[in-house]
C-alpha cells in the first residue's frame, strides 16, 4: 500500500529470520559480548538481547557500561541446562523444557526476573500436581516465595488431603500429636475454630513458656477443652473449676510447664503489663487443610512457626470412676457441633495480595480495592460473597491506588487520595456505581493526600489527617465533601498530626484512632462532633499503633492490628464510648498492618495487609459473641 505516494512495506518474514540468525550467532560465539558462567559452564551471548529479556541482567549491564571487552556474569546457584533453556527463549521466544527441568527453569527465571517464564513454569507445575507431588511442590513454591502459586497448591491440598496423607512426603513431615480430654459421649467439634485454638496454644507454649516446637512433638500432648471453649494444658487447669482438685493434680503431672498466660484484658485507666501483650514474631502460622478421619480423630496440615507439619487430634472420652484413666470431667463440655449439612473450610483468599487497600461493605458484600504488594499499586477491585465464599472482580478503578481508605456514601463507593506508586500523594478521587459497574471521577481534594482516614457522616464524605508531600510527618487537615454540591470545604483541624490513622463513624461522631505524628506511633484518639465542629481527645488505646483497621460492632469500636514501630500486630482492642474505656479482646490468627477491616452482617472481617514478612491475600473473621478470630467459614452443602 502506498499512501500519499510514499512506500510502506512490512517484511513479515524478517523478524523470524533475524531471530534465527541471532541464535545461530550466539551458538557459534560470533559477535558475542557477554559470557555467562553457570556453575563452571560457560555460555556466550549478546548483551543487548539478554538486556531486553531480563531486567536483572539489564541492571548488571547498565552498571557496567564502561566495559569494552566481554562482560562476565557468574551464577553459582543455577542449573546450566535451565539457563540454556532461557537463552533459547530470549532469542526465539520459544520455551522448551523437560518436566524434570521445569523447577530449575522456574528458579532461573525468578533469579533473572523473567516474569513471563516464571508464570508459565508455575502454571505448568500446578497443572501437574497430584497427591504424590503435592507436599514437595508446596515446599518448592514456598521456598521460592510465590504466594500466587502457594494459594493454588493449598487449595488443591484442601480438596485432596486424605489422598496426600498416604504419601511418603506427608508421612515424613514433623507431627504434633494432641490428645484432647472429652466428656463421655461427646465428640470433637467439626469446627475450624478448634485448629485456631491449637495454634494459639502452640504460640503460648513457645512464646510464654519457652517451649521448643521440636520438644512439643517428641511426645503426645494431653490437653483439656474447657466448658468456656478454651484449649488448655494441665498447667492452666487451676484456673477452672470444672475439674476436681485431685484430677487437676493428675493432669499437671503430665504437663509440668509453668503457666504465665494472662488474659489480654485491660482498661484505659490502667497499664497493660508487658508480659500480658503477646507480640507476634515475623513467622508464618496457618491452617492449610483438615479432615475428619474417625469419629473423634482429625488430621490437619498446618504451618507452625514457619514449619510445615501435621497436627493429629484425638478426642478421648474419660471412663467413669476409672482411676487409671484420664480424670473424668465434672461438667459436660459445651462443644459446638456443626449441622450435618454444613461444611467448614478456610476462607478463600483474594486473587491479589494487598496492603494499604480500601475495604467497605456494599449490599452485603465485602469490597476490597487497590492496595499494593511487592510489585505494584493495584487498580483491581474484588467482591467477596459470604454465602458462596467466592471472590469475583468488579470494574477496576481508573487510577492505581494504595495507602487510602474507602467509604460508602449514598449507595456508592468513594475512594480519595492515596498513592499510585509513582507519586506519593494523589488529590484525585472516584466513585463506584454498583448498578452500572462504572467508576467516575469526583472533584479533586484541595491538596494531595496520602495515608489519610476516610469515612461518611450525615451524607458527607470526610478526609482526615494524612501525610505531607514528603511522607515524613502527619497532617492536621480535615476536609469534607458534599456529594450534592460536589464541593470540598474545610472543617476544624485535629489536635495532633496523624498519618496512617484508623477512622470510623460511631454515634453521629467521627473517631480518629492512633496513626503516627512523624515516625512515632500514637495511642491517642480524637472524637469529632459535627454540631460544634470540634475535635476532642478521648481515652487513649492500650497499644500505640499506625496502619490499623477499625470497624463498629454493638455500639463499640474494634481496632485491629497495625504496626507499633517494631512489629506488625495481631492484638485487637475495643472502645466503649459510654464508658470512655478501651480493653483488649481476642487477637487475630495473623499479624496484619495496613489491612482492610470492615463489618459485614454481625461479624468483622480483616483482609490482606502485611505481616512483617509477606504481603497477605488471606482473610479472617471475628465473632464478637465468642471473642474469637478464625480463618474459617461455614458453608451449607448443596
Curated annotation (Swiss-Prot):
Pfam families per the UniProt record, alphabetical: BACK, BTB, Kelch_1, Kelch_KLHDC2_KLHL20_DRC7
Region Disordered, residue ranges: 251-273
InterPro entries per UniProt: BACK, BTB-kelch_protein, BTB/POZ_dom, Kelch-typ_b-propeller, Kelch_1, SKP1/BTB/POZ_sf
Domain BTB: 32-99
Keywords (A to Z) from UniProt: Cytoplasm, Cytoskeleton, Kelch repeat, Nucleus, Repeat
Iron found in the keyword field: no
GO MF terms, alphabetically ordered: ubiquitin-like ligase-substrate adaptor activity
Gene3D superfamilies per the UniProt record, alphabetical: 1.25.40.420, Kelch-type beta propeller, Potassium Channel Kv1.1, Chain A
An annotated GO cellular component: cytoplasm
Subcellular location: Cytoplasm; Cytoplasm, Cytoskeleton; Nucleus
Kelch repeat ranges per the UniProt record: 365-411, 412-459, 461-508, 509-555, 557-602, 604-638
Repeat listed as a keyword: yes
Start and end residues of each BACK domain: 134-233
Primary location group: cytoplasm
GO biological process terms, semicolon-separated: proteasome-mediated ubiquitin-dependent protein catabolic process
Function of the molecule: Plays a role in cell division and in the dynamic organization of the actin skeleton as a stabilizer of actin filaments by association with F-actin through Kelch repeats.
Stated name of the protein: Influenza virus NS1A-binding protein homolog
Source organism (scientific name): Xenopus laevis (African clawed frog)
Amino acid at each position: 500500500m502506498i499512501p500519499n505516494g510514499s512506500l510502506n512495506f512490512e517484511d513479515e518474514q524478517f523478524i523470524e529470520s533475524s531471530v534465527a540468525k541471532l541464535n545461530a550467532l550466539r551458538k557459534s560465539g560470533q559477535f558475542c559480548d557477554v559470557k555467562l558462567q553457570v556453575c563452571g559452564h560457560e555460555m556466550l551471548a549478546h548483551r543487548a538481547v539478554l538486556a531486553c529479556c531480563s531486567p536483572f541482567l539489564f541492571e548488571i549491564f547498565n552498571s557496567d557500561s564502561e566495559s569494552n571487552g566481554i562482560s562476565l556474569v557468574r551464577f553459582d546457584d543455577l542449573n546450566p541446562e535451565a539457563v540454556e533453556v532461557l537463552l533459547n527463549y530470549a532469542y526465539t521466544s520459544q520455551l522448551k523444557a523437560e518436566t524434570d527441568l521445569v523447577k530449575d527453569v522456574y528458579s532461573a527465571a525468578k533469579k533473572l526476573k523473567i516474569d513471563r517464564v516464571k508464570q508459565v513454569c508455575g502454571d505448568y507445575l500446578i497443572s501437574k500436581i497430584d497427591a504424590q507431588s503435592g507436599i514437595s511442590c508446596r515446599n518448592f513454591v514456598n521456598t521460592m516465595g510465590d504466594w500466587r502459586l502457594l494459594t493454588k497448591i493449598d487449595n488443591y491440598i484442601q480438596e485432596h488431603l486424605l489422598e496426600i496423607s498416604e504419601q511418603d512426603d506427608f508421612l515424613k513431615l514433623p507431627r504434633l500429636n494432641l490428645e484432647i480430654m472429652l466428656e463421655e459421649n461427646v465428640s470433637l467439634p467439626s469446627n475450624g475454630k478448634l485448629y485456631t485454638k491449637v495454634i494459639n496454644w502452640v504460640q503460648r507454649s513457645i512464646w510464654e513458656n519457652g517451649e521448643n516446637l521440636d520438644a512439643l512433638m517428641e511426645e503426645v500432648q494431653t490437653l483439656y477443652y474447657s466448658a468456656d471453649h478454651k484449649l488448655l494444658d494441665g498447667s492452666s487447669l487451676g484456673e477452672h473449676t470444672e475439674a476436681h482438685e485431685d484430677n487437676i493434680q493428675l493432669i499437671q503431672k503430665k504437663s509440668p510447664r509453668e503457666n504465665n498466660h494472662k488474659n489480654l484484658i485491660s482498661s484505659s485507666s490502667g497499664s497493660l503489663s508487658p508480659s500480658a501483650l503477646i507480640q507476634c514474631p515475623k513467622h508464618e502460622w496457618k491452617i492449610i487443610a483438615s479432615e475428619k478421619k474417625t469419629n473423634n480423630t482429625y488430621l490437619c496440615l498446618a504451618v507452625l512457626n514457619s514449619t510445615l507439619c501435621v497436627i493429629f487430634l484425638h478426642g478421648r472420652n474419660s471412663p467413669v470412676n476409672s482411676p487409671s484413666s484420664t480424670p473424668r470431667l465434672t461438667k459436660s463440655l459445651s462443644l459446638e457441633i456443626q449441622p450435618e449439612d454444613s461444611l467448614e473450610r478456610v476462607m478463600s483468599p483474594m486473587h491479589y495480595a494487598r496492603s494499604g487497600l480500601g475495604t467497605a461493605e456494599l449490599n452485603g458484600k465485602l469490597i476490597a480495592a487497590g492496595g499494593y504488594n511487592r510489585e505494584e499499586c493495584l487498580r483491581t477491585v474484588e467482591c467477596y460473597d459470604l454465602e458462596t465464599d467466592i471472590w469475583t472482580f468488579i470494574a477496576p478503578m481508573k487510577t492505581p491506588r494504595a495507602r487510602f481508605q474507602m467509604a460508602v456514601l449514598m449507595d456508592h463507593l468513594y475512594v480519595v487520595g492515596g498513592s499510585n506508586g509513582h507519586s506519593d500523594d494523589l488529590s484525585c478521587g472516584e466513585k463506584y456505581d454498583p448498578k452500572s459497574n462504572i467508576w467516575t471521577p469526583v472533584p479533586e481534594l484541595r491538596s494531595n493526600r496520602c495515608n489519610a482516614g476516610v469515612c461518611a457522616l450525615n451524607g458527607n464524605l470526610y478526609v482526615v489527617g494524612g501525610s505531607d508531600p514528603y511522607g515524613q510527618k502527619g497532617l492536621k487537615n480535615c476536609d469534607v465533601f458534599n456529594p450534592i454540591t460536589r464541593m470540598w470545604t474545610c472543617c476544624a483541624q485535629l489536635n495532633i498530626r496523624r498519618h496512617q490513622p484508623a477512622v470510623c463513624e460511631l454515634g453521629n461522631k467521627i473517631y480518629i484512632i492512633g496513626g503516627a505524628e512523624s515516625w512515632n506511633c500514637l495511642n491517642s484518639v480524637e472524637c469529632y462532633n459535627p454540631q460544634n465542629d470540634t475535635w476532642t481527645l478521648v481515652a487513649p488505646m492500650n497499644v500505640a499503633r499506625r496502619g490499623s483497621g477499625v470497624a463498629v460492632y454493638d455500639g463499640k469500636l474494634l481496632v485491629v492490628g497495625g504496626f507499633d514501630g517494631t512489629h506488625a500486630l495481631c492484638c485487637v482492642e475495643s472502645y466503649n464510648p459510654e464508658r470512655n474505656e478501651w480493653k483488649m479482646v481476642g487477637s487475630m490468627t495473623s499479624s496484619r498492618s495496613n489491612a482492610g477491616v470492615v463489618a459485614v452482617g454481625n461479624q468483622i472481617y480483616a483482609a490482606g495487609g502485611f505481616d512483617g514478612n509477606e504481603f497477605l491475600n488471606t482473610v479472617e473473621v471475628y465473632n464478637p459473641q465468642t471473642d474469637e478470630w478464625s480463618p474459617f467459614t461455614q458453608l451449607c452443602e448443596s
